[in-house]
Amino acid sequence: AQWWNMRAVPDTRKGIQQQLKLLGEETSQSLMLAAYGLSLTDHYWMQPVSKELYWKNINFFENEFSDELGNLLTDTGKIDVEGHISCFSPASSVNGEMKKKWVIRDHTRFLMKINTNNYGQQAVNEKIACRLHERLGWKNYVPYEIEMTRIDGLQVPGSLTPLFTSLDTELVSAYQLIKDYKIPNDQSEYEAIINVAVKNGMEELEVRAQLEYMILTDFVLSNTDRHYNNFGFLYSCEAHKLIKMAPVYDTGNCLFYDKDIIPVKSGLLEIRVNSFCKKEADMLAYVKNR
């Protein structure tokens, strides 16, 4: 049940309760069922007892979907205020507090994220992070572009990023990987993630290299939100194992995006983060290849 709930739009996302009421849905989970629980991050779905459906005919990787639900959930585009909205969309299975929707451009699926708070700085930060990865020569990252979107008469910057899963691969977050793993008392969560990843097909050096790179670049950018759902692995449905690290993604909560006063001097060592450690500076202890 927890896994299923985490695939849905969270109840705490701004505006979701009013949107559910408009759609005549009681919960985000029931909204997700309107699209059979289909997602663009994994291959799980619900087969109704009363219908005979086939994955090839309904999956969002190969089949088109309506923009209507995505427009409603992100306050973008035109919607039917009477609630006659097609809910057959992967927008119902995108979690996180920020408003998001999937769009199709030239047959490619893109995730669009919209945030009207903090002048839309998070979208700009994603682009800055991409330029950093590019300058450092790091290949395994998700490219982000900035797209201006009109909301309530205002132009707001949103981020647009291409799908990095496929018909053959699913995203397994670090949280999903270790949530049922009993971590020994003498092992850190950081080492536990590496250990479980290796047991499920990964090469240890590859995992360490990307985690250390991620920690270092997060430090440079002062990304404060590298929680365990913000990095992960790609799982092969055919090989039934992890095959590579997922590209670096979700770095928008960086560059003091929500600060009125930027820390200086010793204050920089006290920055709190949501990750392996409570303080940003302490994260560097995990970096061995310097």
Language model features with spans:
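Phosphate/dinucleotide-binding and metal-coordinating scaffold of catalytic cores
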Residues: 1-216, 220-221, 234-290
